[in-house]
Amino acid sequence: VLMIALTITLCDQFASHVCKPIFTRFRPTHHPDFMDQVKVVFGYRGGKYGFISSHAANSFGFAMLLALIFRNRWLTGSLFLWATLNAYSRIYLGVHFITDIIPGALSGLFFGWVVYRLYRLGVVRWHLPEESVWLSTRKAHVMAVAIVGVIVFLFVLADPLVSVLK
């Protein structure tokens, strides 16, 4: 849990407090040339700047860390499917360009890998029991099915949920 928190913190702080203030690239919903042409959902426009996407960084950082720790192809596939859909949703909502998403995803992959390396150093240095964090194949499959199940559930119920939220 500590490694997940560290990954999300690094990804989010890098995207929000390093990249966005340095690059100051407008989101599609704030770009003066075409902000009026961007269709927004529920009036949500996001903050002023969008490079790089924090959602993409956080999602891919989380997926990378867990994929490296648990090393289960079904869990890895479902985590990266979730991360990809989460990142795509930012484009769909009109709050990011694809060129915000890809660098965000890449930075997330990097920070997920860095935190995994720190985790491995801790396991070796302090002789931590690895067995306590490794998932059995059955548990990993259950987690993968749960993640995919939530994704399918949200796709099936997307229209009714939006109707309720309106």
Language-model features and meaning:
Residues 29-37:
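Alpha-helical transmembrane-segment detector that highlights a single hydrophobic TM helix
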Residues 3, 33-34, 81, 99:
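Residue-level detector of alpha-helical recognition elements and their boundaries
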Residues 1-14, 76-77:
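Interfacial segments of alpha-helical transmembrane regions
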